[in-house]
Swiss-Prot record:
The lineage of its organism: Bacteria, Pseudomonadati, Thermodesulfobacteriota, Desulfuromonadia, Desulfuromonadales. This is Elongation factor Ts. It holds the Pfam family EF_TS. Keywords: Cytoplasm, Elongation factor, Protein biosynthesis. Gene3D superfamilies: 1.10.286.20, DNA helicase RuvA subunit, C-terminal domain, Elongation factor Ts, dimerisation domain.
Length: 303
């Protein structure tokens, strides 16, 4: 299969590996992008796991907390200038208020609801803002946590670049210490970017894929085959400690895991506390901009 400039460009964007390494990996994988990513990872040439969520979409992530309810909303636009536009900010915050008050089931339901202070629906207000601001605006996603017993914390990092919701279940949800830990955990999640709540959420397929990468690297580094499995056992636990929130080292006190911090709060307030769920929005994650200039740059490397 012929390896094109756009294929090399896509693989390099996904992995951060060099152009020639990407071209070689694509040749070995017969043009299959995902197989090429694995080839580069096994050779230690890829930062794919950490760069997989790089994105270039602009706009805002906003959050709102009212009582036991918390929401995140992401609205995208064409340029980063829009994030500073008062009309755009008012629209995004208005959408968050609609979500808190009405708790719609999905985007379609949200867009059909009345927009505050107007006689328009959310969808009609979106169209109105497109005409006013002069850029395409996309109401991309939202999430709403509403806990029966406990607290929901909201954290927005930077100018709407990252948003986090954390839900703590406890019979003492009104205790300020619960709210304080929720805010700190939300900041931890913004910084540490866990992929799962706990190891039970990691599929067997993902675990086996990680083990195979570890096995290949260990054997290629000259480690005796008889001790490779022991090495993998240690490395897979380290992997869980990196990607699972409850097993991560707490950023405020790295000597403690997140699980231990939550347990300690329960002892302090005299009631069980459970970190039941979280969500992290990163502005534009999964939305890539085309870069024709970059494709042209690598064209000569693929001839």
């Amino acid at each position: 299969m012929k390896i094109t400039a756009s294929m090399v460009s896509e693989l390099r964007t996904k992995t951060g590996a060099g152009m020639m390494d990407c071209k070689k990996a694509l040749s070995e994988a017969d043009g299959n992008i995902e197989e090429a990513v694995d080839i580069l990872r096994k050779k230690g040439l890829s930062a794919a796991a950490k760069k997989a969520d790089r994105a270039a979409a602009e706009g805002l992530v906003v959050g709102l907390n009212e009582g036991s309810c918390g929401v995140l909303v992401e609205v995208n636009a064409e340029t980063d200038f829009v994030a500073k536009n008062a009309n755009f900010q008012e629209f995004t915050n208005g959408v968050a208020k609609v979500v808190v008050s009405s708790k719609p089931a999905d985007l379609e339901a949200l867009k059909a609801l009345p927009f505050p202070g107007t006689d328009r629906t959310v969808a009609e207000e979106q169209t109105h803002q497109i005409a006013t601001i002069g850029e395409n605006i996309n109401l991309r996603r939202f999430v709403c946590f509403d806990v029966a017993q406990g607290a929901v914390a909201v954290y927005i990092h930077g100018v709407g670049k990252i948003g986090v919701l954390v839900e703590l279940e406890t019979s003492k949800g009104d205790d300020e210490r619960v709210a304080a830990l929720g805010r700190n955990l939300a900041m931890h999640i913004a910084a540490a970017n866990p992929q799962y709540l706990n190891r039970d959420e990691v599929s067997a397929e993902v675990v086996e894929k990680e083990k195979e990468i570890m096995r290949t690297k260990a054997l290629e580094s000259g480690k005796p085959e008889k001790i490779v499995e022991k090495i993998i056992a240690g490395q897979i636990n380290k992997y869980f400690g990196e990607v699972c929130l409850l097993e991560q080292a707490y950023v405020i006190d790295p000597d403690l895991t997140v699980t231990k911090v939550v347990e300690n709060l329960g002892k302090e307030i005299g009631a069980e506390v459970t970190l039941s769920r979280y969500v992290r929005f990163q502005l534009g994650e999964g939305l890539e901009k085309r870069s024709d200039d970059f494709a042209a740059e690598v064209a000569s490397m693929t001839k």
